[in-house]
Swiss-Prot record:
This is Inner membrane protein YhiM. Residues 24-41, 96-104, 179-190, 247-257, 312-324 are periplasmic. GO terms for biological process: cellular response to acidic pH; temperature homeostasis. Signal peptide: none annotated. It comes from the Bacteria. It is found in: Cell inner membrane. The chain crosses the membrane at residues 3-23, 42-62, 75-95, 105-125, 158-178, 191-211, 226-246, 258-278, 291-311, 325-345. GO terms for cellular component: plasma membrane. It holds the Pfam family DUF2776. It is a multi-pass membrane protein. InterPro entries: DUF2776 (IPR021240).
Length: 350
């Protein structure tokens, strides 16, 4: 990979993170209304995902340009995990007060969910520490065995366990909230947290794919399994969002319904990464360099929809939160474009 292109792909996640923080701060300073509180806090929290994606980009690009660096393989996942833990603590702090307001309740749950995603993405960074083994293993055969440089089976299973456990936590928590969906804050927080949990579940497939390909244990059975898994979760999340929008006339349905649809777009962006790794595993795919266009389209979908919603929010404040949050989700999708491009450069056969 060209060193200048490498730096561009490293900078994209940081720039997108700064945009989320800047827009979130601007929204918070604009008004003290509850809609501004929720949108501003959620936007700022999305920077944690961008930070985690930056650590992933840095680790892989460094290997492509300079080879494996043990120090980077340790430092950058720690940075990503630190950002995710801080985000989860921030979300929990909003929920820990004695008299939690509705806006704090919703924002706290969403921010905690964003922190969970950041932790899963940081696990992608941690599992990518020996990314160069993937094209090497793909050029060989399963009979070659596990390379001595690869993670042990125990470490690999521990890495996969991180998104699995966070997915279970998010699913149980969101279902608990939805059991009292007659309470509006529970209804909103439960649906959005369930969508965030779907993203964590998608990242199970990505981490498992990277770990198994690195260890040369990527089986024929799971070759397309994770692709189906991620596309299924993305589609279910989009359908859930549509259901929320059409199942009621209450304005409270607008934010979770619209945001769920765009969380599905993030799932599709993750699908592009899982699909790419599956396509180039022990085969040649002439269209592999087109796959990075998927997160570009999902990014544009989020941003264009946000622009329409911003106009609608002038007359109906129910559209205000999604019109702002979707900008941050679009930034995350564009950050995923840089990651998919890096994976394509590192793993596709030219």
């Amino acid at each position: 990979m060209n060193i200048y292109i490498g730096w561009l792909f490293k900078l994209i996640p940081l720039i997108m993170g700064l945009i989320c923080i800047a827009l979130g701060g601007f929204v918070l300073e604009s008004s003290g209304q509850s809609e501004y509180f929720v949108a501003g806090h959620v936007l700022i929290s999305l920077a944690a995902i961008c930070l985690a994606l930056f650590t992933t980009a840095f680790i892989i690009i460094s290997q492509l340009t300079r080879g494996v660096n043990t120090f980077y393989n340790t430092l950058f996942p720690i940075i990503g995990y630190a950002g995710s833990i801080i985000t989860m603590i921030w979300g929990w702090a909003l929920l820990a007060g004695n008299d939690v307001m509705a806006d704090e309740f919703v924002a706290g749950h969403v921010i905690f969910g964003v922190g969970m995603i950041a932790a899963c993405v940081s696990t992608v960074a941690a599992s990518s520490g020996h990314f160069l083994l993937i094209p090497k293993n793909a050029a060989g055969s399963k009979s070659d065995g596990t390379p001595v440089q690869a993670y042990s089976s125990l470490i690999g299973n521990c890495l996969i366990a991180v998104p699995v456990l966070l997915t279970l936590l998010g699913f149980i928590w969101s279902i608990t909230l939805l059991r009292s969906a007659d309470i509006t804050p529970h209804y909103v927080a439960g649906h959005v947290l369930l969508g965030l949990t779907a993203i964590c579940a998608c990242l199970i497939g990505l981490v498992a794919t990277i770990v198994h390909q690195t260890r040369n244990t990527f089986s024929t059975k799971e070759h397309w399994l994770w692709c189906y898994w991620v596309i299924f979760l993305g589609s279910i999340t989009v359908l859930q969002g549509i259901y929320v929008l059409v199942s009621s006339d209450a304005s409270a349905r607008l934010a979770p319904g619209i945001i769920l649809i765009c969380l599905g777009m993030i799932c599709y962006s993750i699908f592009s990464k899982v699909w790419l790794l599956a396509l180039v595993w022990r085969r040649t795919c002439s269209l592999a360099n087109r796959i990075p266009m998927i997160p570009v389209f999902t990014c544009l979908f989020c941003l264009f929809l946000a622009s329409f919603l911003a106009e609608m929010a002038q007359t109906d404040m129910g559209y205000f939160i999604p019109s702002r949050v979707l900008v941050g989700l679009g930034a995350v999708c564009f950050t995923l474009f840089s990651i998919v491009s890096i994976l394509e450069a590192g793993s596709a056969k030219k």
